[in-house]
Amino acid sequence: MKSLGKHLLAEYYRCDENAINDVQKVEEALVKAAEIAGATVIGKSFHRFEPYGVSGVVVISESHLTIHTWPEYGFAAVDVFTCGDHVDPMKAHEYLKEVFQTQNATVETILRGVLNIPDLRHKPGGSCITGNCGDKKIG
């Protein structure tokens, strides 16, 4: 069985409340996590809620990273979804745990697009976001 991607669902408990309530720090952390994982960042959007909390997304050529924080509980929910073979979502997860000074974390990995075929014609990543994957046209 082949899969098109890996989706990490992480829960970070007892985080540094100031770190996960600082929209600039959260944005910088997610962008750097994507880069450490080997992904190509193509966009981002973050929002700080009043009185506290941050939500954000980093769009990568290989899929996305998202975060939703509850500083009042020291909690953050993080998704790292990557496609292709050159990105390591666990590197992003490990980096984010460190940056947010997480005391306890859980992570679940889900394989996405599990296909029962001998070989994948194409595994998304890189320039394939546009539908042009070298000599293969997608869509």
From Swiss-Prot:
PTM description: Is synthesized initially as an inactive proenzyme. Formation of the active enzyme involves a self-maturation process in which the active site pyruvoyl group is generated from an internal serine residue via an autocatalytic post-translational modification. Two non-identical subunits are generated from the proenzyme in this reaction, and the pyruvate is formed at the N-terminus of the alpha chain, which is derived from the carboxyl end of the proenzyme.
Residues found modified as Pyruvic acid (Ser): S63
Entry EC number(s): 4.1.1.50
Cofactor list: pyruvate
GO CC terms, sorted: cytosol
Cofactor note: Binds 1 pyruvoyl group covalently per subunit.
Entry similarity comment: Belongs to the prokaryotic AdoMetDC family. Type 1 subfamily.
Complex and partners: Heterotetramer of two alpha and two beta chains arranged as a dimer of alpha/beta heterodimers.
UniProt name for this protein: S-adenosylmethionine decarboxylase proenzyme
Organism: Nitratiruptor sp. (strain SB155-2)
Originating gene: speH
